[in-house]
C-alpha cells in the first residue's frame, strides 16, 4: 500500500515538473520574441532620430548663415 502511494506521488511530481519545464520553455521563447520585437522597434526609431538630427543641424546652420549675411548686408 505504502509503495503504491509513493509511486503515485513520484509519478505525479514527474508530471508536474515535466509540464512546468514545458511552460518555462514557452515563456522563454515568448520573452525572446518580445525582446526581438523591441530591438527591431528601437532600430527603426533610431533611424527616424537620425533624420531628425540632420534636419535640426541643417536648420541651425541655415539660421546662423542667414543671420550672418543679414548683419553684413545692413
Curated annotation (Swiss-Prot):
Q: Name one GO cellular component term.
A: helical viral capsid
Q: Which Pfam families match?
A: Phage_coatGP8
Compartments reported by the entry: Virion; Host membrane
**Keyword annotations of the record:** Capsid protein, Helical capsid protein, Host membrane, Membrane, Signal, Transmembrane, Transmembrane helix, Virion
Broad class of where this protein is predominantly found: virion
Q: Which residues form the signal peptide?
A: 1-23
Topology Cytoplasmic: residue spans: 67-74
Residue stretches spanning the membrane: 46-66
- Keyword field contains Ribonucleoprotein: no
| UniProt-listed InterPro entries | G8P, Phage_M13_G8P_capsid_dom_sf
Q: Which residues form a coiled coil?
A: none
Residue ranges, Periplasmic compartment?
A: 24-45
Disulfide links within the chain? none
Transmembrane helix among keywords? yes
Membrane topology, as annotated, equals:
Single-pass type I membrane protein
What does the function comment of this entry state? Self assembles to form a helical capsid wrapping up the viral genomic DNA. The capsid displays a filamentous structure with a length of 760-1950 nm and a width of 6-8 nm. The virion assembly and budding take place at the host inner membrane.
Its quaternary organisation is: Homomultimerizes. There are several thousands of this protein in the phage capsid.
Q: What family does the entry list?
A: Belongs to the inovirus capsid protein family.
- What is this protein's name? Capsid protein G8P
Amino acid at each position: 500500500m505504502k509503495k503504491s502511494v509513493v509511486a503515485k506521488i513520484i509519478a505525479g511530481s514527474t508530471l508536474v515538473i515535466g509540464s512546468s519545464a514545458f511552460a518555462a520553455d514557452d515563456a522563454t521563447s515568448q520573452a525572446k520574441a518580445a525582446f526581438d520585437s523591441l530591438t527591431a522597434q528601437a532600430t527603426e526609431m533610431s533611424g527616424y532620430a537620425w533624420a531628425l538630427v540632420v534636419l535640426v543641424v541643417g536648420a541651425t546652420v541655415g539660421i546662423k548663415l542667414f543671420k550672418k549675411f543679414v548683419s553684413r548686408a545692413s
